[in-house]
Every structure is written in C-alpha cells, then in structure tokens.
C-alpha cells in the first residue's frame, strides 16, 4: 500500500531528499505550509489523510485511522482551499508532473548541461514546487532556498528562476543577470525585460500552462461562455476526495474568465467570482487595473465592486499611493480613454497595502 507523506520542512536540500525518498518508496508527498498556525495544519492533515509527517526532528507516524489510500502512480497532493476555505487536495501523478515539466522545459529550451534552477518561492504552493519538479525531471542543477532574497539569488549559479511581481520588482535592473525569469502570481508590471516570461496556470494544471499568452506544447485552451477551459496530460488526476473535475472529454473548467482568439492567443481576465456587474454591465477588474497602475501616484491598485443602491455594484479602485495619488476624475478619464465608460471607477479608496497571498495574488475578499 502506498502512503501519503506530509513534508513540513523549510526550503532546502533536505526537502528535496524527502521527496526523492518518498517517490523511491512508491509514496506520494504533501508539502505543508510551515507558516500555517497549528490548528490549520491539524485541519489540513485531517482533511487530506497523510500517513506520515516529516518535520525537523524526523519522520512521525500519524493516526492510521485518518490515513487515506492513494492510487498507483500518484506522486503529489497539493493543498488548496475550496469555496468553504477547508483544505482541498489536488492529486497529481508522476505522468502529469512529467508532462508539465517536459512542456515547460521544451518551451524554455532547457539544457541540463548548462542550466540551473533556483527555487525560492514557497514549496507548499505549486508555483514554488514546480521549479523543483521540473529540475528533477530535466536533470538540471537545482538550488533550493527558504524564501527569496535578492543578494542570495544574485550570488547563486542559477540561470533560471520563478518569481512573483513583488520579488521581480526588488531585483530591479539586476534582473538581466538571469537567462530566464518565469513570472506568475499576481498581474505583471506594465514594462518587462526581455528575459521575463509571464505565465498563467493553476494548482490543477501543475503550474504554468500558458506562457506569454501562448499555450505550451500539449496544452489545449478554449473559451466556453466566457470561462477558460483547458485540456492536456498535465492536468490533475482528481481531488483528494476522489472527484474528477474534468468533463467526459477531458476539459477542466478553470474558473477564470478569458478569451482565445483565432490564432490561439489566450487572454486571462481574472476569476469569474471577481467579475463586477454594475447596472447590468460586466466589468473585469484586470483591464481596469492595468490602466490605473500606469498613472502617476499609483504604487499598486486592485479593482473591486462595492455595494451601490442604484447600480448593484460600483466599480471601485483601491489604490496604494506613491506620493500624491491621482484624483477620481483622472482615474475615470484614463479608463474611459481605453475602455467602455461603465468600466471607469465610480470611487477610489486609499490604503497602505493590498492584502496578498504567499504568491503575491491580491486577496480581494479581504478588501
């Protein structure tokens, strides 16, 4: 019988060694976010059913009554939250991991004799762990550190790394030190260096599947009723509760709004839950945010819908100012110059910081 092994270790060589050990034994791994409070970790373990946990002082057996079986070929369970906020495990197989790593490596032209990955994002998130997985698959050099630090990254022998926009911003003009920077998480900056590749993906897709707007080899993307759907060998096998979210033809509904043009170029508008309906008109936050972010006096911005007695929801720009913020009229004029008038924010709010996840995505529900 195969076991699920929870790994609660900082980023480093030992984490990678424990992944290798588990796979050599035919087991699967569950990375645990060490920043979670004790009660949250307990809920995660109870919900996803590992048999063992690896911590700083070694491997510990968990209650056998709570352990849940795996299928042959299962390699990885990634914890992600469902709509209830309870942990939901995404199950990937060795085959889906290999498909993702192969597609990414082919697109980036990875040469195991020349290239070296730096893993510096949280390993309990697919954006961080996928760096480790693709390096192991391709046989490249790999350095794993417990968090991003500018000087550590620059001093490493890495040619490739994955970052979120806030980390990229900290690198500044030294980003050209790397051959390729794979960028995920929140919306990218307006101006990007030539060596930066923007990505779109989910835990269910095994990390990025669309690079600079184009699907990776072996990835199919289509739009159905305004929602992006994807198909390919890199998709999850199922959730930990056994539910396979793919339809009979293998398509997975992402929950993201977007479009695919006649040439296959993919545009992602945001989570369908983030769509703002104002006076029966539909407004996606992302295009509005990109315009407002270019204005003088705006360090960061998130666009949300606020309750409105007449329109139902009012488009509202939540701005982290950089010096003197723009006026509401300046924001509205800028948006109306590029988008339909109903997309223009009816209000602005100034805040000190935007709440973000570990991978830099704005937590809109917290605004």
What does each model-found stretch correspond to?
Residues 1-36, 119-122:
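Conserved AMP-binding/adenylate-forming
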Residues 10, 63-79, 86, 109-116:
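Conserved pre-ATP/AMP-binding loop-to-beta segment of ANL
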Residues 39, 55-74, 100-101:
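Flexible, low-complexity linker/hinge segments
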Residues 46-56, 78, 88-170, 180:
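AMP-binding/adenylate-forming
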Residues 74-89, 186, 201-204:
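Conserved adenylation A10 loop of the ANL superfamily
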Residues 159-163, 167-215, 220-222:
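Gly/Ser/Thr-rich phosphate-binding loop
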Residues 215, 224-250, 271, 283:
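Conserved ATP/PPi-binding loop(s) of AMP-dependent carboxylate-activating enzymes
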Residues 232, 257-343, 353, 360-362:
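AMP-binding/adenylate-forming catalytic core of the ANL superfamily
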């Amino acid at each position: 019988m195969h076991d699920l092994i929870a790994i609660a270790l900082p980023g480093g060589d030992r984490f990678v060694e424990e992944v290798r050990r588990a796979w050599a034994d035919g087991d699967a791994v569950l990375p645990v976010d060490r920043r979670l409070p004790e009660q949250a970790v307990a809920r995660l373990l109870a919900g996803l059913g590992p048999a063992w946990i690896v911590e700083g002082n070694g491997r510990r057996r968990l209650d056998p009554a709570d352990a849940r079986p795996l299928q042959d070929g299962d390699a990885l369970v990634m914890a992600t939250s469902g709509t209830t906020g309870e942990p939901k495990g995404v199950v990937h197989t060795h085959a889906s991991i290999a498909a993702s790593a192969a597609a990414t490596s082919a697109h980036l032209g990875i040469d195991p004799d020349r290239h070296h990955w730096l893993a510096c994002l949280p390993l309990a998130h697919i954006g961080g762990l996928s760096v480790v997985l693709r390096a192991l698959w391709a046989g490249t050099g790999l350095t794993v550190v417990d968090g991003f630090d500018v000087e550590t990254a620059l001093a490493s022998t890495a040619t490739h790394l994955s970052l979120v926009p806030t980390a990229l911003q900290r690198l500044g003009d030294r980003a050209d030190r790397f051959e390729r920077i794979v960028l995920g998480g929140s919306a990218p900056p307006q101006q990007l260096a030539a060596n930066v590749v923007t990505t779109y993906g989910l835990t269910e897709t095994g990390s990025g599947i669309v690079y600079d707007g184009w699907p990776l080899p072996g990835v199919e993307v289509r739009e159905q009723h305004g929602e992006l759907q994807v198909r390919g060998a890199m998709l999850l096998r199922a959730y930990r509760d056994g539910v396979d979210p793919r339809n009979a033809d293998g398509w997975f509904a992402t929950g993201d709004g977007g479009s695919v043009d006649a040439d296959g170029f993919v545009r992602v508008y945001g989570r369908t839950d983030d769509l703002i309906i104002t006076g029966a008109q539909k407004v996606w936050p992302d295009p509005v945010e990109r315009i407002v972010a270019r204005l003088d006096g705006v360090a960061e911005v998130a666009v949300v819908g606020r309750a409105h007695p007449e329109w139902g929801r009012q488009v509202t720009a939540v701005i982290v100012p950089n010096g003197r913020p723009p006026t509401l009229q300046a924001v509205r004029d800028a948006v109306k110059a590029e988008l339909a008038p109903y997309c223009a924010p009816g209000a602005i709010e100034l805040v000190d910081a935007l709440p973000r996840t570990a991978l830099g995505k704005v937590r809109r529900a917290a605004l």
